Amino acid sequence: MLSRIVLLIAAVPFVSGCIVVANVNDPAWWDDSDEITRDISIDVDRVNFEARGTLYVVQGRSNRLRIQGHNQALQQIAVDDRSGALLISQETDDFRWWGVQRPGSEAVFYLELENLSSLRHSGHGEVKLGPLIVNTLSVISSGHATTNFSSLIARDLTIRATDHANVDIETLDSDSAELRVNDHADIFVQDINVLDVKLRAADHGDLRLAGTADTAFVSAQDHANIDAGALESAVVNLNTRNHAQVTTQAHELIEIDERDNSSVSWTGSALQQ
């Protein structure tokens, strides 16, 4: 009897008739951990991550996935690799403590890839990538996901964050990059070096970046915010709508289309058209 703890929730307005029984001495909950290693036979260059926990992605000479976690979490994880895509998913765990996920339900994933051209990340997990050197890369982060890049070099790059997702990039070098945020998501680039960049924000999205760009196309609407005040751009083409806010910097030429109670602030020596 002492090995079990019975908690009776008496606050009916919050939880009606709820009884939670937890055996804190059950080792399967706390210290029954294991590891799975899987060699990926196909040439994977696309990754879909829909599991709890953290995925680490590094570039290497082989395609290999290693997973560490409690046995119960490992049993919930499914890995499918076919047609050049790797899908990592996890069954929903309905057992929670007052809405908080039970300890041990998350795993740690270590993925080594020769090349990466597409990443789709959704859910409450976290993905940490880099350093990466690729030709083209498309990233979609959604559903409260957190996607972090250390160092990224890509000739052609597209990143989209939506539905409260967060994307953070330490250093980015690219010929052409497009960064898009909407639905309360945000993207933050600490240091970018790019020839041409497209910045698009809508529906309370937040986009911040610093660095250098030859040409910047900036579009914001529906209460979104773009802070490119620390981005040294030669040419800027800018349009704002519906209470959006934009801060930018231009040194040769700037064109502004500002409407619907939006706000634009810019610095530099550019000629305004």
Label for each model-derived stretch:
Residues 82-84, 145, 221, 241:
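A short, structured loop/turn motif at beta-sheet edges
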Residues 165:
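Internal active-site segments that recognize and position negatively charged phosphoryl groups
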Residues 18-50, 54-122, 126-141, 148-160, ...:
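Acidic (Asp/Glu) and glycine-rich low-complexity loops/linkers
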